[in-house]
């Protein structure tokens, strides 16, 4: 029986990623933009029900909830390619429609103000699941809505659905602040991710921007945000492929998370993907007329194609996944792996995976913790027959690695620089319903303590005495 996953898209970033994600899932499952099934998809042995349900008229509807504090992005989705796909009853926009102004407390308060309506949507969607596995939240931690309302949801969902897994795809900000108060928003959200979530896939904007720059020539770099959203949706689709297109391993959310998270606090995951292609980055194809009118663009497109990775070797695929340049987090690989899962899609055999696993383990490319087993797993997922891929195999790595603490340290350091001056606090104070300045100062202090503790725990995980450190 499929174990269903409900996707909650929160804020501008979360909804933009979600739109591309559903487009991709529809393609992989042979679902048309209006929710009907392509004739050739009726015989395809997959698990659509994990992420979709069938309405009374047999149209497929995403198990998706769209939340925002202003109408812009959701209005775009309602008028876009998947406008007939989304259930309009699963959309909530704050009644004021004014947005959160990049202030975490405003986003949180909007969540509280709309709690009854939001929880009604969530409960209705959960009641429609036969065997709910959990929730998947897409959001950014830097702005106001994805961070503030996202934090509110993390608080409430962990209390209301204690048996359901709470997993997130969380976009972390660039090291150089795009939003001047993003250190405040980030540390308050990181606290909730540490305390409430069961697994967090960290998607670091610095690394995402680097990948986009390295793989798309300037002439074809039309909209960086679209390319980033496409890359993130590729990671999301690949990470859920074993749930939707199952093989023998990690075919439900619980087994996927439990294979990667050995202790409750160590649940922040890195990801890598290869090969990076034009489809995974949403690089538009050029017609012959366009190429004739612009030789430079045509040449750039050819160059982009030449840089794509084509390999049949599973070992080489995994080695590429292990290389930091293919990672979605910009923290290097100094430290140790706690656990590692490689999901391979395409024309591969189980014995190839086993042999490559043994070969990688025998090499010196991967350093594992000393207090547990060398937890490196391989999962084979079949590929959708409805996608046209130039390469025979593709791979996604989900890894629990101690180097992730560098991301936490960076957030902590930038927060300290801003907070030590008490800079830009007034907007946070003004949007507090109760408590005012004393309460927001206490929240910041508590959040920083959690962030510091989280970094120290990942550092301790590099030691053979880690289990003693956590009292086991």
From Swiss-Prot:
UniProt record similarity statement: Belongs to the tubulin family.
Role, per record: Tubulin is the major constituent of microtubules (Potential). The gamma chain is found at microtubule organizing centers (MTOC) such as the centrosome. Component of the gamma-tubulin small complex (gamma-TuSC) involved in microtubule nucleation for the formation of median bodies and in the biogenesis of flagella. Gamma-TuSC may be required for the correct positioning of EB1 within the trophozoites.
Pfam families: Tubulin, Tubulin_C
Gene Ontology biological-process annotations: axoneme assembly; cytoplasmic microtubule organization; meiotic spindle organization; microtubule nucleation; mitotic cell cycle; mitotic cleavage furrow formation; mitotic cytokinetic process; mitotic sister chromatid segregation
Stored Gene3D superfamilies: Helix hairpin bin, Tubulin/FtsZ, C-terminal domain, Tubulin/FtsZ, GTPase domain
A GO CC term assigned to this protein in UniProt: left ventral flagellum
Major localization class: cytoplasm
Signal peptide per UniProt: none
Domain of life: Eukaryota
Residues the record lists as binding GTP: 142-148
SUPFAM superfamilies: Tubulin C-terminal domain-like, Tubulin nucleotide-binding domain-like
Subcellular location: Cytoplasm, Cytoskeleton, Flagellum axoneme; Cytoplasm, Cytoskeleton, Flagellum basal body; Cytoplasm, Cytoskeleton; Cytoplasm, Cytoskeleton, Spindle
Keyword Cytoplasm: yes
GO MF annotation: an example: GTP binding
UniProt protein name: Tubulin gamma chain
Higher taxonomy: Eukaryota, Metamonada, Diplomonadida, Hexamitidae, Giardiinae
Assembly and interaction partners: Component of the gamma-tubulin small complex (gamma-TuSC) composed of tubulin gamma chain, gamma-tubulin complex protein 2 (GCP2) and gamma-tubulin complex protein 3 (GCP3). Interacts with GCP2 and GCP3. Interacts with EB1.
The species this protein was found in: Giardia intestinalis (strain ATCC 50803 / WB clone C6)
Keywords: Cell projection, Cilium, Cytoplasm, Cytoskeleton, Flagellum, GTP-binding, Microtubule, Nucleotide-binding
Disruption phenotype: Knockdown of expression by morpholino results in an arrest of cytokinesis, leading to reduced growth rate and increased number of cells with four nuclei. Knockdown has various defects including increased number of disorganized cells impertinent for cytokinesis and increased number of cells without furrow. However, knockdown does not have an effect on the number of cells defective in cytokinesis or abscission.
């Amino acid at each position: 029986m499929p174990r269903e996953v409900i996707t909650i898209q929160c804020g501008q970033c979360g909804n933009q990623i979600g739109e591309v994600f559903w487009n991709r899932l529809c393609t992989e499952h042979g679902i048309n933009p209006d929710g009907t099934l392509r004739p050739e998809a009726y015989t395809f042995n997959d698990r659509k029900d994990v992420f979709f349900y069938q309405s009374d008229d047999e149209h497929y509807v995403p198990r998706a909830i769209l939340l925002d504090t202003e109408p812009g992005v959701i209005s775009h989705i309602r008028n876009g390619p998947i406008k007939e796909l989304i259930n309009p009853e699963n959309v909530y926009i704050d009644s004021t429609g004014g947005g959160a102004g990049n202030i975490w407390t405003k986003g949180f308060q909007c969540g509280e103000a709309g709690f009854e309506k939001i929880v009604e949507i969530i409960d209705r969607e959960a009641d429609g699941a036969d065997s709910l596995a959990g929730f998947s939240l897409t959001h950014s931690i830097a702005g106001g809505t994805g961070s503030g309302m996202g934090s509110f949801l993390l608080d409430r969902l962990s209390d209301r659905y204690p048996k359901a897994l709470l997993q997130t795809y969380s976009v972390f900000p660039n090291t150089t602040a795009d939003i001047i108060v993003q250190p405040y928003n980030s540390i308050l959200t990181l606290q909730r991710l540490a305390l409430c979530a069961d697994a967090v896939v960290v998607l670091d904007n610095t690394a995402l921007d680097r990948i986009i720059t390295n793989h798309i020539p300037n002439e074809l770099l039309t909209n960086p945000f679209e390319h980033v959203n496409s890359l993130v949706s590729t990671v999301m689709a690949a990470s859920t492929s074993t749930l939707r297109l199952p093989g023998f391993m990690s075919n439900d959310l619980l087994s996927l998370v439990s294979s990667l998270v050995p202790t409750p606090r160590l649940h922040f995951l890195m990801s890598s993907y290869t090969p990076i292609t034009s489809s995974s980055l949403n690089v538009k194809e050029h017609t012959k007329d366009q190429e004739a009118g612009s030789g430079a663009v045509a040449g750039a497109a050819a160059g982009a194609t030449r840089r794509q990775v084509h390999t049949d070797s599973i070992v080489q695929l995994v080695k590429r996944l292990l290389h930091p340049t293919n990672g979605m987090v910009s923290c290097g690989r100094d430290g140790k792996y706690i656990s590692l899962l490689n999901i391979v899609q395409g024309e591969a055999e189980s014995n190839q995976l086993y042999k490559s696993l043994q070969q990688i383990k025998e090499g010196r490319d991967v350093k594992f913790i000393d207090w547990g087993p060398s937890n490196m797993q391989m999962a084979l997922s079949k590929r959708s027959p409805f996608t046209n891929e130039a390469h025979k195999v593709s791979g996604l790595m989900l890894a629990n690695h101690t180097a992730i603490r560098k991301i936490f340290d960076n957030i902590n350091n930038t927060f300290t620089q801003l907070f030590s001056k008490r800079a830009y606090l007034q907007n946070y104070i003004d949007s507090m319903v109760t408590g005012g300045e004393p309460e927001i100062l206490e929240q910041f202090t508590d959040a920083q303590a959690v962030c510091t503790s989280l970094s120290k725990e990942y550092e301790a995980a590099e030691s053979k005495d880690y289990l003693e450190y956590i009292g086991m």
